[in-house]
């Protein structure tokens, strides 16, 4: 499978991103039925999209208000494209653009996401977690690979 192109979000991407959030994020956010809901969920965030053959198939949204400490708020791939490395491509693009001071929250019960971030070198911070309306969560922090000697 060919890799996607990762680029900055454009307003014309809103319908595709809305659909992706509704499908891939439904377990977290419930159905997101309109562009206003997507816009509210990502307000003030820097958004990158993954595109293949002119179609947006994933997106990542980063809260940048606490620079240089950035928070990866959303990373979703359309379910029809999951398991193809698109999430890893988006995550690498986020790190390249916003690293090295990145963190995110994930639900403790979301073992798939926890494995995904661990494979990418992110580290769970056992001292930073809590409970929200979705349940127990843990903070995950990006750790740059040590320099090669």
List where the protein language model places each region.
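Conserved active-site alpha-helix within GNAT-family acetyltransferase domains
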Residues: 88, 109-126, 132-135
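Conserved GNAT acetyl-CoA-binding A-motif
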Residues: 97-109
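A short, glycine/Asx- and small/polar-enriched loop/turn
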Residues: 44, 136-138
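Terminal substrate-recognition subdomain of acyl/acetyltransferases
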Residues: 138-149
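Acetyl-CoA-dependent GNAT
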Residues: 4, 8-82, 88-93, 97, ...
């Amino acid at each position: 499978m060919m890799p996607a192109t990762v680029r900055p979000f454009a307003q014309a991407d809103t319908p595709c991103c809305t659909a992706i959030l509704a499908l891939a994020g439904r377990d977290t956010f419930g159905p997101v039925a309109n562009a206003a809901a997507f816009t509210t969920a990502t307000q003030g965030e820097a958004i990158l999209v993954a595109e293949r053959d002119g179609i947006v198939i994933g997106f990542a949204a980063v809260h940048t208000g606490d620079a240089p400490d950035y928070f990866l708020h959303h990373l979703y791939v359309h379910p029809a494209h999951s398991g193809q490395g698109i999430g890893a491509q988006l995550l690498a693009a986020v790190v390249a653009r916003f690293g090295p001071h990145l963190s995110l929250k994930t639900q403790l019960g979301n073992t798939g996401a926890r494995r995904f971030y661990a494979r990418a070198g992110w580290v769970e911070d056992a001292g930073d977690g809590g409970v929200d309306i979705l349940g127990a969560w843990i903070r995950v922090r990006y750790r740059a690979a040590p320099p090669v000697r």
